[in-house]
Amino acid sequence: MVKNSFIPVLSQEKKGKNPGLVEFQIFQFTNRIRRLTSHFELHPKDYSSQTGLRKILGKRQRLLSYLSKKDGIQYKKLINQFDIRQSQIR
């Protein structure tokens, strides 16, 4: 498994940007989530990593909620770009 193969185009665009930006943090969490989900295909009983995945999902959801309130246009753009399902609770 190659770590950086999930979102290679986006990582090239984001290299020069501030890692404190909400968009960049969502990008990093999305990358980690995709890596962990591929990890679970090989190791389905890795429960400690599943707990970590749930924490990351919660953090990303809170950031997405913040971004939707702050800048709805950027939120929709980010959702489409990363293929993230839109939150049911808004």
Swiss-Prot record:
CDD domains in alphabetical order: S15_NS1_EPRS_RNA-bind
Annotated compartments: Plastid, Chloroplast
Keywords, sorted A to Z: Chloroplast, Plastid, Ribonucleoprotein, Ribosomal protein
Gene Ontology molecular function terms on file: structural constituent of ribosome
PROSITE patterns per UniProt: RIBOSOMAL_S15
Presence of keyword Chloroplast: yes
SUPFAM superfamilies named in the record: S15/NS1 RNA-binding domain
One of the protein's GO biological processes: translation
Highest rank taxon of the organism: Eukaryota
Descriptive protein name: Small ribosomal subunit protein uS15c
Source organism: Phaseolus vulgaris
Lineage, top ranks: Eukaryota, Viridiplantae, Streptophyta, Embryophyta, Tracheophyta
